[in-house]
UniProtKB/Swiss-Prot annotation:
Similarity remark: Belongs to the phosphatidylethanolamine-binding protein family.
Record's protein name: Protein TERMINAL FLOWER 1
Keywords annotated in UniProt: Cytoplasm, Developmental protein, Differentiation, Flowering
Chief localisation class: cytoplasm
GO biological process, any: meristem determinacy
Effect of L113N: No effect on terminal flower formation
Source species of the chain: Arabidopsis thaliana (Mouse-ear cress)
Molecular functions per Gene Ontology: transcription coregulator activity
Pfam hit, one: PBP
Note: Mutagenesis of His-88 to Tyr converts the repressor of flowering 'TERMINAL FLOWER 1' into a 'FLOWERING LOCUS T'-like activator of flowering.
Tissues with expression: Expressed below the apical dome of inflorescence and coflorescence meristems, and in inflorescence stem.
Alphabetized CDD domains for the sequence: PEBP_euk
Gene name linked to the record: TFL1
Family matches, as PROSITE patterns: PBP
Location(s) in or outside the cell: Cytoplasm
Length: 177
């Protein structure tokens, strides 16, 4: 498991997800994120048009008595050189039973499709293991200025157990062809 952890965390450090969004953590749960059967891999680029529908998020860990919270954010809003609105919240699903996928959880913040305007944005999926099944009603006046670390502290989620990110930038007409 230790090697898996190192292999999984390195691209998150290189992509500055660890640092900008998350504190260093040891991945202990396998999470697969896919859009129309295309798996999300750390640092790979996806076109916004290919991520317009909600992804499938599978959790390979825990059991049906363990519960997970999934958070999806963009730390590069409005642009990576001056992300003064960071983090932008895209999605929160809570109470996802282990060994299932996000459709079995409770969506507390609906999925918002990525719309990067300036530069290349990172879209980060973070998975936390909950200490127990619980009601999470985040008070989110705006999707901008969300803070994943504060959210984890507020709901006693501890460090993440998994994370993955992809890059996307605005599609021009030429790139869509």
């Amino acid at each position: 498991m230790e090697n898996m952890g190192t292999r999984v965390i390195e691209p998150l450090i290189m992509g500055r997800v660890v640092g900008d969004v998350l504190d260093f953590f040891t991945p202990t749960t396998k999470m697969n994120v896919s859009y129309n059967k295309k798996q999300v891999s750390n640092g790979h680029e996806l076109f916004p048009s290919s991520v317009s529908s909600k992804p499938r998020v599978e959790i390979h860990g825990g059991d049906l008595r363990s519960f997970f919270t999934l958070v999806m954010i963009d730390p590069d809003v409005p642009g990576p050189s001056d992300p003064f609105l960071k983090e932008h919240l895209h999605w929160i699903v809570t109470n996802i039973p282990g060994t299932t996928d996000a459709t079995f959880g409770k969506e507390v913040v609906s999925y918002e499709l990525p719309r990067p305007s300036i530069g290349i944005h990172r879209f980060v999926f973070v998975l936390f293991r909950q200490k127990q099944r619980r009601v999470i009603f985040p008070n989110i006046p705006s999707r901008d200025h969300f803070n994943t670390r504060k959210f984890a502290v507020e709901y006693d989620l501890g460090l993440p157990v998994a994370a993955v990110f992809f890059n996307a930038q605005r599609e021009t007409a030429a790139r869509k062809r």
